[in-house]
């Protein structure tokens, strides 16, 4: 496999025909790879790249476990962390979290620093709470954040609150509560928390296949309920899920990845013949009883994945009408009084641009099947652009993703020369013809693919952008049809993860966009 094929310069006078042939060949390679990686059940599910967060937490949990083999697994985790794992730097909280977790796993003794003002953001404050709880449990000093007594009070109040939380978030909250109560000597309170934790454990020993939740639960269980079946199963799961390189990986997302892949590749003849039907069947089967879809099989529905599934299932040869009606009813039920949608069915979860846009787009695609009002949501998105000069996605980093995913909620034809968001994105192109994740960054294939898709959706049809962006994708495509990727998806926010399946689909999305433009123009951009 080569890192990328070198594309010879193409004389402008003879540009379109050879460029279209090369683009068609690149699409064939990309489609072939998508079909080759489809699973037997019709889904796509990729193992994300390693990062410090999961490996450090799992290493820490096993290093403190007396279970046979735990010490050897912890040493393998430490070896990977020592070998050059670097904390993420795109966001101060991400950097602080990974710096602290690496230090805790390697027992280097530095204070756990949660002093950055960004930790006070409502969506990120739980990260400070997690770090402070683990630091207290391991007798590590902290810099910033709540004093131990205040941390204890906040955790106790959160545990007692009637607000609905994601189930894995609830496990993490109970785990932190148990660790802090143990620090203060209240073993009875800690034991009560571990019973609640154990009630959420799967037969395999994990908690929603999430290594972060499972490692935190392991710390709490082995400290407050040593020797119990729940503690043993949790430890056994951590041992079994460690990969050969010593790492643990973030949770996979088969439903989300399948909806995205189906959305992007549907319409390619080979894909429609060999993959689309099985993907549709998988999504239909993955629908939850409440009508929504989960980001991965077996967990609760979220509005982003529900909208993504409805978008992917729109059009001919889609899902049964009953499936679509149930999904639309779920979105109708999830609409907040102000006409918006959260990502999760959780109290306090704020609305974010990409989720609102996905829901509006899904409802637009099925407009004849529902009466859900979307004007307030569309106005909210327009207001966000007016206030900020751009959109910010809640679940993926970067201007290209936010622009590409929000624009379908608007009518590009309403703006002569294209939507202002698309024009602004076009102007961020780098000299090599590609686009960066954020202005000033180097070009990446996924940002370039997203930008090309956004220009199509935003009505910007300048031939230069399409031609140069396409050349960048042709130049960087590997022989197996894939492209090099970068961490792009947030989870848990603000940490980033790289999912190869998502990188492939989002990059190919731009390739499809340019090819459609070339074909519509009769072979010229």
Task: Label every PLM stretch briefly.
Residues 30-40:
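N-terminal signal-anchor module of multipass membrane proteins
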Residues 2-29, 44-75, 83-153, 161-186, ...:
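An alpha-helical repeat/solenoid feature that recognizes helix-turn-helix modules
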Residues 36-38, 240, 287:
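Assembly/interface hotspot detector across virion components, adhesins/toxins, and nucleic-acid enzymes
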Residues 34, 77, 81, 193, ...:
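Buried hydrophobic core positions in alpha-solenoid tandem helical repeats
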Residues 181-197:
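Short linear, low-complexity motifs centered on an aromatic residue
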């Amino acid at each position: 496999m080569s890192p990328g094929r070198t594309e010879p310069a193409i004389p402008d006078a003879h540009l379109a025909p050879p460029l279209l042939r090369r683009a068609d060949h690149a699409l064939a390679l990309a489609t072939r790879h998508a079909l080759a990686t489809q699973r037997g059940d019709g889904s796509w599910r990729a193992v994300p790249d390693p990062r410090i967060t999961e490996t450090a937490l799992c290493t820490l949990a096993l290093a403190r476990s007396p279970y046979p083999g735990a010490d050897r697994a912890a040493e393998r985790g430490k070896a990977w962390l020592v070998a050059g794992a670097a904390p993420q730097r795109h966001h101060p909280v991400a950097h602080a979290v990974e710096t602290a977790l690496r230090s805790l796993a390697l027992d280097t003794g530095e204070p756990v620093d949660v002093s950055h003002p960004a930790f006070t953001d409502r969506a990120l404050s739980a990260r400070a709470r997690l770090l402070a709880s683990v630091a207290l449990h391991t007798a590590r000093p902290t810099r910033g954040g709540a004093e131990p007594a205040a941390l204890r009070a906040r955790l106790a109040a959160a545990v007692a609150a009637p607000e609905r939380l994601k189930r894995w978030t609830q496990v993490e909250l109970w785990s932190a509560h148990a660790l802090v109560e143990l620090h203060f000597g209240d073993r009875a309170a800690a034991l009560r928390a571990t019973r609640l934790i154990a009630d959420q454990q799967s037969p395999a020993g994990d908690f929603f296949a999430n290594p972060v939740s499972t490692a935190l639960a392991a710390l709490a269980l082995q400290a407050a309920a040593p020797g119990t079946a729940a503690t043993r199963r949790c430890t056994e799961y951590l041992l079994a899920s460690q990969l050969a390189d010593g790492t643990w990986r973030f949770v996979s997302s088969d439903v989300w990845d399948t909806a995205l892949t189906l959305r992007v590749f549907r319409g390619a003849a080979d894909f429609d013949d060999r993959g689309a039907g099985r993907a549709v069947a998988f999504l239909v089967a993955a629908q939850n009883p409440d009508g929504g879809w989960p980001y991965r099989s077996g967990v609760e529905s979220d509005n982003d994945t529900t909208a993504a599934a409805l978008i992917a299932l729109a059009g001919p040869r889609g899902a049964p009408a009953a499936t679509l009606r149930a999904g639309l009813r779920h979105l109708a039920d999830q609409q907040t009084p102000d006409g918006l949608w959260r990502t999760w069915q959780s109290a306090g979860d704020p609305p974010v641009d990409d989720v609102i846009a996905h829901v509006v787009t899904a409802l637009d695609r099925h407009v004849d099947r529902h009466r859900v009002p979307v004007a307030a949501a569309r106005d909210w998105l327009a207001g966000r652009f007016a206030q900020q000069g751009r959109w910010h996605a809640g679940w993926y980093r970067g201007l290209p993703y936010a622009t590409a995913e929000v624009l379908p909620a608007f009518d590009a034809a309403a703006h002569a020369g294209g939507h202002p968001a698309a024009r602004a994105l076009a102007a961020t192109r780098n000299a090599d013809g590609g686009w960066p994740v954020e202005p000033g960054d180097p070009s990446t294939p996924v940002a370039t693919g997203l930008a090309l898709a956004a220009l199509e959706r935003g009505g910007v049809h300048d031939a230069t952008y399409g031609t140069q962006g396409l050349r960048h994708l042709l130049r960087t495509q590997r022989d197996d049809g894939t492209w090099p990727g970068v961490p792009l998806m947030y989870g848990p926010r603000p940490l980033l993860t790289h999912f190869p399946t998502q990188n492939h689909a989002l990059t190919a999305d731009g390739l499809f966009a340019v090819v459609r433009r070339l074909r519509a123009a009769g072979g010229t951009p």
